[in-house]
């Protein structure tokens, strides 16, 4: 017995104590102590009470002075009847009574965890990572091999084991990343995906984010081969229960959030550079935007190719004093219910990109071609483009009628030029003109912005200076500004009214209305090749004297797809001719509803046509 006395005090106490069960609830410790004192001296007797209710649980512990007395109590008092119940006396150190014995205080034996010291759940991932990293490669490979065999032989048991021990599943997942069996990004997705697993054993399934199962994982988490003999790495079960666990060992960059950003719309390939005087809405309707800086790109109609000179200045003019964009010829005013977009045809172009005060020059039919090399005061503001099949040349010779007839742009013209096809003009936007006749979306042939061409380019009252060549009324600038086919400008002059000098199609095909402001062959202000506006261009003297020169194609110097004498009448020509006829057929009431500048321009236009008709 002396050998027992030198044992650990807690263990010795457990050997000297007995477990007493099936105690009546009304019994007191004093009554029980008296009963157990029959076999020997009782050091203490303690009943176990429920912590929540405070009621006795029906069992307790009796401590004797020595182990022999405790053994005697188990032999003699087991089955003793007390208050109608038979008391059960057993060894307090048995496995069944260990938990109850702990309530007695430090007398309970201290059992070391085979997994190491407990660890805070928040530090568990880092601890597991260190444990996995400390394993030699050979041992890690052997563990993974054994786990594979375990899954192959007993899949369900392996799954249950990993579900009940999430720290083990995490360690295996980490080992796969270390051994490069699994991509870190895939491991992260497995860890963070939300999976609700039905517990196989009630109360056993744990979420890693709450706490480590049982004893927390420690540096010695990954046991040797003897522990993982029947374990293997399951590809699917591992992530379960790891969904909400904080992962500190995997770099944050692996956590790649899936961001479904809305792709920004790509740039419209054929966009007017900068803030043009006008732009087309996606539906093709012209929106008056003269003088408004920052106008976005303009979509084209029917796949027309719009070419522009990147070096051209971007006119950014201030808003007009009234705060509203300058009004166009037909329905550009915000208060016009008809909503047309034909341009205003009066006023000079200011370099800053908005319409200035009207030019008070003589009417167009009185203007004579001046041999000046300066820019015309009636520059067009620049519509986006015209027909891509046509190119503008520099009209240095006599204008050729579409049917091959020579014509004098300043006054005389063949009477046949007044035919319907001779009256077509790029001034009329053929794609936006409404049947009311008021919305002719001026000067746009399949994509030309009506407002893009400063209507003051069509100023019929101002003089039309003719530049360096017998252009017969066409307004030539000092040098050819070749906008065709994306070519760079060939002249020093940049048309301030065009949103980006070289807006292709800036030339309004004046195949018929060869107006003073309309630079010949699509702002033939020096040969600006309107990339498709050639041929049928508004020759700036075309309305002078002779008025509307019918369907004139720039002959001679015209490097376009039209040969100098070509007399074909295309469907586009017929459409444009019909459009200009609609403009000319506007009633007096319709014209009266227009702003003063536009109304005056329409009247001047009709007057020129009447005079030219009478002359023919």
Swiss-Prot record:
Record carries keyword Nucleus: yes
GO cellular component term of the entry, any: nucleoplasm
GO molecular function: mRNA binding; RNA binding
Positions of region (Disordered): 203-241, 262-418, 542-573
InterPro entries documented for this protein: CSTF2_hinge, CSTF_C, CSTF_C_sf, Nucleotide-bd_a/b_plait_sf, RBD_domain_sf, RRM_dom
Region annotation (9 X 5 AA tandem repeats of M-E-T-R-[AG]) ranges: 418-462
Organism name: Homo sapiens
Residues the record lists as Phosphothreonine modifications: 320
Extent of Basic and acidic residues compositional bias: 368-381
Gene3D superfamilies linked: 1.25.40.630, 3.30.70.330, Transcription termination and cleavage factor, C-terminal domain
The keyword 4Fe-4S is annotated on this UniProt entry: no
Domain RRM residue range list: 16-94
Sequence repeat residues: 418-422, 423-427, 428-432, 433-437, 438-442, 443-447, 448-452, 453-457, 458-462, 505-509, 510-514, 515-519, 520-524, 525-529, 530-534, 535-539, 540-544, 545-549
Function: May play a significant role in AAUAAA-independent mRNA polyadenylation in germ cells. Directly involved in the binding to pre-mRNAs.
Designated name of the protein: Cleavage stimulation factor subunit 2 tau variant
Region (9 X 5 AA tandem repeats of G-[AT]-G-[MI]-Q): 505-549
SUPFAM superfamilies listed in its UniProt record: RNA-binding domain, RBD
Organism superkingdom: Eukaryota
Chain intervals with Low complexity compositional bias: 223-233, 319-331, 550-568
GO BP term (any one): mRNA 3'-end processing
Subcellular location: Nucleus
Keywords recorded for this protein, A-Z: mRNA processing, Nucleus, Phosphoprotein, Repeat, RNA-binding
Phosphoserine: residues bearing it: 563
């Amino acid at each position: 017995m002396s050998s027992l006395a030198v044992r650990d005090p807690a263990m010795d106490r457990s050997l000297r104590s007995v477990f007493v069960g099936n105690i009546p609830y009304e019994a007191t410790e004093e009554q029980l102590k008296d009963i157990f004192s029959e076999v020997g001296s009782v050091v203490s007797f303690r009943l176990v009470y429920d912590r929540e209710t405070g009621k006795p649980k029906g069992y307790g512990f009796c401590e004797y002075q020595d182990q022999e007395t405790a053994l005697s109590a188990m032999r003699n008092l087991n089955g003793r009847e007390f208050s109608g119940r038979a008391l059960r006396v057993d060894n307090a150190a048995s496995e069944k009574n260990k938990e109850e014995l702990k309530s007695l205080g430090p007398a309970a034996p201290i059992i070391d965890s085979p997994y190491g010291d407990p660890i805070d759940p928040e530090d568990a991932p880092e601890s597991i990572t260190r444990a996995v990293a400390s394993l030699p490669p050979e041992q890690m490979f052997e563990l993974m091999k054994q786990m594979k065999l375990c899954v192959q032989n007993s899949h369900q048991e392996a799954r249950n084991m990993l579900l009940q021990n999430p720290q083990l599943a995490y360690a295996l997942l980490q080992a796969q990343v270390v051994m490069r069996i699994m991509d870190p990004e895939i491991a992260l997705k497995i860890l963070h995906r939300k999976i609700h697993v039905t517990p196989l054993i009630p109360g056993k399934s744990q979420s890693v984010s709450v706490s480590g199962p049982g004893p927390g994982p420690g540096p010695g988490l990954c046991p040797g081969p003897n522990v993982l003999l029947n374990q293997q790495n399951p590809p699917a079960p591992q992530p379960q229960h790891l969904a909400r666990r904080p992962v500190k060992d995997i770099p944050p960059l692996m956590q790649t959030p899936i961001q479904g950003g809305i792709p920004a719309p790509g740039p419209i390939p054929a966009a007017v550079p900068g803030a043009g005087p006008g732009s087309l809405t996606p539906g093709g309707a012209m929106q008056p935007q003269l003088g408004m800086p920052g106008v976005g790109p303009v979509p084209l109609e029917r796949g027309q190719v719009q070419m522009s000179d990147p070096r051209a200045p971007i006119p950014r003019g201030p808003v007009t004093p009234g705060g509203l964009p300058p009004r166009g010829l037909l329905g550009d005013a915000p208060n016009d219910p008809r909503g047309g977009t034909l341009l205003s045809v009066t006023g000079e172009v200011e370099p800053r990109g908005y319409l200035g005060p009207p030019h008070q020059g003589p009417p167009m039919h009185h203007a004579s071609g001046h041999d000046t090399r300066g820019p015309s005061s009636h520059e067009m503001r620049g519509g986006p483009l015209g027909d891509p099949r046509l190119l503008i040349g520099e009209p240095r010779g006599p204008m050729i009628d579409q049917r091959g007839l020579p014509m004098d742009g300043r006054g005389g013209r063949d009477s046949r030029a007044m035919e319907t096809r001779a009256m077509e003009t790029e001034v009329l936007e053929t794609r936006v003109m409404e049947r009311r006749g008021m919305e002719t979306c001026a000067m746009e042939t399949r994509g030309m912005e009506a407002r893009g061409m400063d209507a003051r380019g069509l100023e019929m009252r101002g003089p039309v200076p003719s530049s360096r060549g017998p252009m017969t009324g066409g307004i030539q600038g000092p040098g050819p500004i070749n906008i065709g086919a994306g070519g760079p400008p060939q002249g020093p002059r940049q048309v301030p009214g065009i949103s980006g000098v070289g807006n292709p199609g800036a030339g309004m095909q004046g195949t018929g209305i060869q107006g003073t402001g309309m630079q010949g062959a699509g702002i033939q202000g020096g040969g600006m090749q309107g990339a498709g506006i050639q041929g049928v261009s508004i020759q700036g003297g075309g309305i002078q004297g002779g008025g509307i020169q019918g369907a004139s194609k720039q002959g001679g110097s015209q490097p376009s797809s039209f040969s100098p004498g070509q007399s074909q009448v295309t469907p586009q020509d017929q459409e444009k001719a019909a459009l200009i006829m609609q403009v000319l057929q506007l009633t007096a009431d319709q014209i009266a509803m227009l702003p003063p500048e536009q109304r005056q321009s329409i009247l001047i236009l009709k007057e020129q046509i009447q005079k030219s008709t009478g002359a023919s």
